[in-house]
């Protein structure tokens, strides 16, 4: 009898977070060295990252549907995956809005905001890397979550 392949959901989460971080890095790079004439090519690069993230999310959802037992609640895994995908989608949306509104010059506040997004995604990467052994890494995950939440609050303040 063929042995059933084990699904590593925490690895899948980590891969999704890597896509969000790649998108944040690309956004930061584009805004730091802003060249409006390169926006179409940069949007295509960003869309490749976002599409890769969508594929990872869909793969995980397919596996969750078929899996009988998961390491944590199925709904929690689904919610994490959806939220991470939303982060990646929203990062892509920033670049799309810059293109749609024909932005010609980047304001310093936008650069600060892009750097905050990148730092937030770095925190998500650190958290995701520890999820595989969440019982052992409970404290580090907690600290990472607090740091991420603090950055999110700062982002909200910077945006308003």
Which sequence ranges carry the predicted segments?
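Conserved small/polar residues in nucleotide/adenosyl-binding loops
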Residues: 149-156
């Amino acid at each position: 009898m063929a042995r059933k392949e084990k699904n590593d959901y925490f690895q899948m989460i980590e891969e999704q977070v890597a896509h969000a971080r790649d998108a944040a890095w690309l956004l930061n790079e584009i805004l730091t060295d802003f060249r409006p004439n390169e926006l179409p090519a940069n949007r295509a690069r960003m869309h490749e990252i976002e599409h890769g993230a969508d594929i990872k999310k869909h793969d995980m959802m397919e596996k969750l549907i078929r899996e009988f037992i998961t390491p944590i609640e199925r709904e929690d895994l689904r919610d994490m995956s959806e939220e991470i995908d939303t982060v990646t989608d929203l990062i892509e949306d920033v670049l799309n809005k810059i293109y749609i509104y024909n932005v010609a010059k980047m304001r310093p506040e936008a650069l600060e905001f892009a750097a905050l997004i990148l730092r937030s995604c770095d925190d998500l990467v650190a958290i995701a890397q520890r999820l595989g052994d969440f019982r052992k890494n409970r404290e580090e995950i907690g600290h990472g979550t607090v740091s991420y939440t603090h950055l999110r609050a700062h982002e909200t303040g910077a945006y308003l």
